[in-house]
Amino acid sequence: SIAELCKVLTTGPLNADTEVVVGCPAPYLTLARSQLPDSVGVAAQNCYKVAKGAFTGEISPAMLKDLNIGWVILGHSERRAIFGESDELIADKVAHALAEGLKVIACIGETLQEREAGQTEAVCFRQTKAIADKVKDWSNVVVAYEPVWAIGTGKTATPEQAQEVHVALRKWFTDNVSADVSASIRIQYGGSVTAANCRELAAKPD
Protein backbone atom coordinates (compact mmCIF):
# COMPACT_ATOMS: atom_id res chain seq x y z
CA SER A 1 0.00 0.00 0.00
CA ILE A 2 0.99 3.63 -0.30
CA ALA A 3 1.19 3.92 3.48
CA GLU A 4 3.62 0.99 3.64
CA LEU A 5 5.81 2.41 0.87
CA CYS A 6 5.84 5.80 2.56
CA LYS A 7 6.85 4.17 5.84
CA VAL A 8 9.79 2.40 4.19
CA LEU A 9 10.95 5.61 2.52
CA THR A 10 10.52 7.57 5.74
CA THR A 11 12.44 5.16 7.98
CA GLY A 12 15.09 4.54 5.30
CA PRO A 13 17.86 5.09 5.58
CA LEU A 14 18.19 6.80 2.18
CA ASN A 15 21.46 7.82 0.57
CA ALA A 16 21.84 11.55 1.16
CA ASP A 17 23.54 11.90 -2.23
CA THR A 18 20.57 10.39 -4.10
CA GLU A 19 17.45 12.40 -4.86
CA VAL A 20 14.37 10.24 -4.38
CA VAL A 21 11.09 11.06 -6.13
CA VAL A 22 7.92 8.97 -5.94
CA GLY A 23 5.44 9.10 -8.83
CA CYS A 24 1.91 8.16 -7.82
CA PRO A 25 -1.63 8.40 -9.26
CA ALA A 26 -3.41 11.73 -8.85
CA PRO A 27 -5.93 10.63 -6.17
CA TYR A 28 -3.08 9.69 -3.83
CA LEU A 29 -0.78 12.67 -4.29
CA THR A 30 -1.92 14.44 -1.14
CA LEU A 31 -1.68 11.25 0.92
CA ALA A 32 1.83 10.52 -0.30
CA ARG A 33 2.98 14.10 0.25
CA SER A 34 1.59 14.15 3.78
CA GLN A 35 3.30 10.89 4.76
CA LEU A 36 6.72 11.41 3.19
CA PRO A 37 9.53 13.57 4.53
CA ASP A 38 10.35 16.77 2.68
CA SER A 39 13.56 15.15 1.45
CA VAL A 40 11.52 12.79 -0.75
CA GLY A 41 9.87 14.38 -3.77
CA VAL A 42 6.42 13.49 -5.06
CA ALA A 43 5.61 13.48 -8.78
CA ALA A 44 2.29 13.51 -10.57
CA GLN A 45 2.10 11.13 -13.52
CA ASN A 46 0.71 13.72 -15.93
CA CYS A 47 -0.47 17.31 -16.30
CA TYR A 48 -1.83 19.53 -19.06
CA LYS A 49 -0.21 22.28 -21.12
CA VAL A 50 -2.23 25.27 -19.91
CA ALA A 51 -2.99 26.79 -16.51
CA LYS A 52 -6.78 26.79 -16.73
CA GLY A 53 -9.72 26.51 -19.10
CA ALA A 54 -12.41 24.15 -20.32
CA PHE A 55 -10.38 20.94 -20.19
CA THR A 56 -12.55 18.64 -18.11
CA GLY A 57 -10.60 15.93 -16.37
CA GLU A 58 -7.19 17.49 -16.91
CA ILE A 59 -4.83 18.55 -14.13
CA SER A 60 -2.78 21.72 -14.49
CA PRO A 61 0.63 22.45 -12.97
CA ALA A 62 -1.06 25.17 -10.90
CA MET A 63 -3.33 22.53 -9.34
CA LEU A 64 -0.33 20.34 -8.53
CA LYS A 65 1.42 23.26 -6.87
CA ASP A 66 -1.69 23.82 -4.74
CA LEU A 67 -1.11 20.28 -3.43
CA ASN A 68 2.58 21.01 -2.75
CA ILE A 69 3.65 18.63 -5.53
CA GLY A 70 7.01 19.58 -7.00
CA TRP A 71 7.47 17.07 -9.82
CA VAL A 72 5.57 15.68 -12.80
CA ILE A 73 6.24 12.79 -15.18
CA LEU A 74 5.50 13.70 -18.81
CA GLY A 75 5.68 11.78 -22.08
CA HIS A 76 5.41 8.30 -20.58
CA SER A 77 5.09 5.69 -23.31
CA GLU A 78 1.60 4.77 -22.16
CA ARG A 79 0.50 8.40 -22.58
CA ARG A 80 2.01 8.36 -26.07
CA ALA A 81 0.64 4.98 -27.15
CA ILE A 82 -2.73 4.68 -25.41
CA PHE A 83 -3.77 8.34 -25.29
CA GLY A 84 -2.15 9.40 -28.54
CA GLU A 85 0.01 12.17 -27.11
CA SER A 86 2.30 13.56 -29.81
CA ASP A 87 5.89 14.71 -29.43
CA GLU A 88 4.65 18.28 -29.87
CA LEU A 89 1.97 18.02 -27.17
CA ILE A 90 4.43 16.51 -24.73
CA ALA A 91 6.92 19.29 -25.47
CA ASP A 92 4.23 21.91 -24.80
CA LYS A 93 3.37 20.20 -21.52
CA VAL A 94 7.02 20.06 -20.47
CA ALA A 95 7.56 23.74 -21.29
CA HIS A 96 4.44 24.85 -19.40
CA ALA A 97 5.19 22.70 -16.35
CA LEU A 98 8.69 24.16 -16.14
CA ALA A 99 7.38 27.70 -16.57
CA GLU A 100 5.00 27.07 -13.68
CA GLY A 101 7.86 25.99 -11.42
CA LEU A 102 7.56 22.21 -11.53
CA LYS A 103 10.46 19.84 -12.09
CA VAL A 104 9.91 17.43 -14.96
CA ILE A 105 10.79 13.82 -15.65
CA ALA A 106 10.56 13.75 -19.45
CA CYS A 107 10.21 10.25 -20.88
CA ILE A 108 11.50 9.03 -24.22
CA GLY A 109 11.99 5.58 -25.73
CA GLU A 110 11.48 3.27 -28.67
CA THR A 111 9.15 0.35 -29.34
CA LEU A 112 10.40 -3.17 -30.04
CA GLN A 113 9.66 -2.72 -33.74
CA GLU A 114 11.66 0.51 -33.83
CA ARG A 115 14.60 -1.12 -32.03
CA GLU A 116 14.60 -4.10 -34.38
CA ALA A 117 14.54 -1.69 -37.32
CA GLY A 118 17.63 0.07 -36.00
CA GLN A 119 15.68 3.23 -35.21
CA THR A 120 16.39 3.51 -31.47
CA GLU A 121 18.56 6.61 -31.68
CA ALA A 122 16.43 8.27 -34.36
CA VAL A 123 13.28 7.89 -32.25
CA CYS A 124 14.91 9.06 -29.02
CA PHE A 125 16.53 12.03 -30.77
CA ARG A 126 13.21 13.01 -32.41
CA GLN A 127 11.38 12.92 -29.11
CA THR A 128 14.14 14.87 -27.36
CA LYS A 129 14.36 17.48 -30.13
CA ALA A 130 10.65 18.24 -29.81
CA ILE A 131 11.26 19.13 -26.17
CA ALA A 132 14.47 21.03 -26.93
CA ASP A 133 12.58 23.20 -29.42
CA LYS A 134 10.42 24.48 -26.53
CA VAL A 135 12.80 24.31 -23.54
CA LYS A 136 15.89 26.44 -23.05
CA ASP A 137 16.62 25.84 -19.35
CA TRP A 138 17.22 22.16 -18.62
CA SER A 139 18.22 22.54 -14.96
CA ASN A 140 14.88 21.17 -13.74
CA VAL A 141 14.55 18.37 -16.28
CA VAL A 142 15.42 14.71 -15.83
CA VAL A 143 15.37 12.67 -19.04
CA ALA A 144 14.02 9.16 -18.52
CA TYR A 145 14.98 6.64 -21.19
CA GLU A 146 12.29 3.99 -21.05
CA PRO A 147 12.32 1.51 -23.95
CA VAL A 148 8.68 0.63 -24.53
CA TRP A 149 9.48 -3.05 -24.99
CA ALA A 150 10.89 -3.22 -21.46
CA ILE A 151 7.96 -1.65 -19.58
CA GLY A 152 5.82 -4.10 -17.67
CA THR A 153 6.95 -6.97 -19.89
CA GLY A 154 9.54 -8.54 -17.63
CA LYS A 155 12.14 -7.76 -20.29
CA THR A 156 14.89 -5.38 -19.31
CA ALA A 157 17.38 -3.56 -21.48
CA THR A 158 20.81 -4.83 -20.57
CA PRO A 159 23.03 -2.36 -18.75
CA GLU A 160 25.08 -2.17 -21.94
CA GLN A 161 22.01 -1.35 -24.07
CA ALA A 162 20.91 1.35 -21.64
CA GLN A 163 24.41 2.80 -21.46
CA GLU A 164 24.66 2.95 -25.28
CA VAL A 165 21.50 5.03 -25.51
CA HIS A 166 22.49 7.29 -22.62
CA VAL A 167 25.88 7.97 -24.23
CA ALA A 168 24.16 8.75 -27.53
CA LEU A 169 21.78 11.12 -25.77
CA ARG A 170 24.62 12.98 -24.08
CA LYS A 171 26.32 13.40 -27.46
CA TRP A 172 23.03 14.66 -28.91
CA PHE A 173 22.80 17.26 -26.15
CA THR A 174 26.40 18.30 -26.80
CA ASP A 175 25.75 18.71 -30.52
CA ASN A 176 22.28 20.26 -30.32
CA VAL A 177 21.94 22.06 -26.96
CA SER A 178 25.25 22.66 -25.18
CA ALA A 179 28.19 20.85 -23.64
CA ASP A 180 27.20 22.21 -20.22
CA VAL A 181 23.70 20.73 -20.45
CA SER A 182 25.11 17.46 -21.75
CA ALA A 183 27.44 17.20 -18.77
CA SER A 184 24.91 18.20 -16.13
CA ILE A 185 21.57 16.72 -17.19
CA ARG A 186 20.41 13.63 -15.38
CA ILE A 187 19.44 10.69 -17.59
CA GLN A 188 17.79 7.75 -15.89
CA TYR A 189 16.71 4.34 -17.14
CA GLY A 190 13.23 2.95 -16.61
CA GLY A 191 11.83 -0.40 -17.68
CA SER A 192 11.35 -3.50 -15.53
CA VAL A 193 13.94 -2.38 -13.00
CA THR A 194 13.94 -4.69 -9.98
CA ALA A 195 15.91 -5.26 -6.80
CA ALA A 196 17.76 -7.98 -8.70
CA ASN A 197 19.04 -5.81 -11.56
CA CYS A 198 19.11 -2.24 -10.23
CA ARG A 199 22.66 -2.40 -8.88
CA GLU A 200 24.10 -3.52 -12.23
CA LEU A 201 22.17 -0.83 -14.10
CA ALA A 202 23.16 1.87 -11.63
CA ALA A 203 26.83 0.92 -11.94
CA LYS A 204 26.95 2.27 -15.50
CA PRO A 205 28.52 5.75 -15.74
CA ASP A 206 25.60 7.37 -17.55
From Swiss-Prot:
GO terms for molecular function: triose-phosphate isomerase activity. Keywords: Gluconeogenesis, Glycolysis, Isomerase. Its EC number is 5.3.1.1. The active site is at H76 (electrophile), E146 (proton acceptor). PROSITE patterns: TIM_1, TIM_2. One of its GO terms (biological process) is glyceraldehyde-3-phosphate biosynthetic process. Pathway: Carbohydrate biosynthesis; gluconeogenesis; Carbohydrate degradation; glycolysis; D-glyceraldehyde 3-phosphate from glycerone phosphate: step 1/1. InterPro entries: Aldolase_TIM, TIM_sf, TrioseP_Isoase_bac/euk, Triosephosphate_isomerase, Triosephosphate_isomerase_AS. One of its GO terms (cellular component) is cytosol. Belongs to the triosephosphate isomerase family. Homodimer. PANTHER family: TRIOSEPHOSPHATE ISOMERASE. This is Triosephosphate isomerase.
